Structures are given as C-alpha cells and as structure tokens.
C-alpha cells in the first residue's frame, strides 16, 4: 500500500506520503509492474537483506525509482533475511537507525534536535 500511495497513481496529493522508508519488500503478486514513479514521488530510504526472498522485488523498485529520478538512499546487507532490520538484532539491525536520522535531517524531514538532551 505504501508503494501505491507513493506512486504517480496515488488518488490524491493529500494521500501521498512526504517520504518512504521500506526496510524490506515483498513481491506484489502481479505480473505487470503496478507502480508508476515520477518527479512527484517522495524520497526513499531503502534497506534490504540480499538473502530475503523479496530482494528481487526490491531491486525492481530501486531500478524504477532511479529511472524516474526519485531521490534514493539504498543499502543492502548480506544476512538477516526479512528480519535484518529489527532494532533488537545486533549489528546493522541497530546501525540503520542512525543513518535514517541523518537522512531525515538531510532531507529536512526531521528539523530539530529536541529529542537530544544537553549534557553538562
């Protein structure tokens, strides 16, 4: 549903998200590519494990986003499957959250540091 709302086929501009953060993907289940991305598609922060069964679909999404000129921050990991980005997982399962905050600041999605406390 997120890809549908982010696509050019979104029923109205108010339903379209400002950004998209898919951490794993899955095959949509249709033979024909169901999404159209364009200049109005919001930026994507994508992470995927190469050993996830949905990796091929994620590569298709990546290719279509790049063809449409959509801003994309893409990284993969080799292990972890569909649960590679659970924050309870050691390693990159924790690290991607720092990258996400930096990406959100860079894209002016996260505008303040109010969540950080000053230390004396």
Explain the meaning of each model-derived region:
Residues 1-39:
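Primarily recognizes the serine-hydrolase "nucleophile elbow" in alpha/beta-hydrolase
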Residues 9-16, 49-52, 89-91:
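Short, charged helix-to-loop "capping" segments that act as catalytic/coupling loops
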Residues 18-19, 55-63:
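Short, mixed-charge, low-aromatic patches
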Residues 19, 42-43, 71:
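Proline-centered loop/turn at the N-terminus of a beta-strand
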Residues 24, 48-49:
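The conserved beta1-alpha1 loop
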Residues 28-29, 50-56:
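Acidic catalytic loop of the alpha/beta-hydrolase fold
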Residues 40, 45-48:
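Short beta-strand/loop motif that positions the catalytic acidic residue
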Residues 47, 59-120:
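C-terminal catalytic histidine-bearing segment of alpha/beta-hydrolase fold enzymes
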């Amino acid at each position: 549903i997120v890809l549908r709302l982010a696509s050019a086929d979104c029923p109205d501009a108010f339903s379209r998200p400002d950004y998209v953060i898919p951490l794993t993907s899955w095959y949509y289940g249709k033979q024909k590519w169901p999404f159209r991305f364009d200049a109005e598609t919001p930026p994507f922060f994508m992470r995927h494990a190469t050993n996830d069964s949905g990796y091929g679909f994620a590569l298709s999404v990546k290719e279509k986003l790049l063809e449409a000129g959509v801003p994309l921050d893409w990284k993969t990991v080799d292990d972890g499957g569909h649960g590679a980005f659970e924050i309870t997982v050691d390693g990159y399962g924790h690290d991607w959250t720092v990258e996400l905050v930096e990406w959100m600041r860079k894209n002016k999605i996260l505008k303040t540091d109010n969540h950080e406390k000053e230390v004396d």
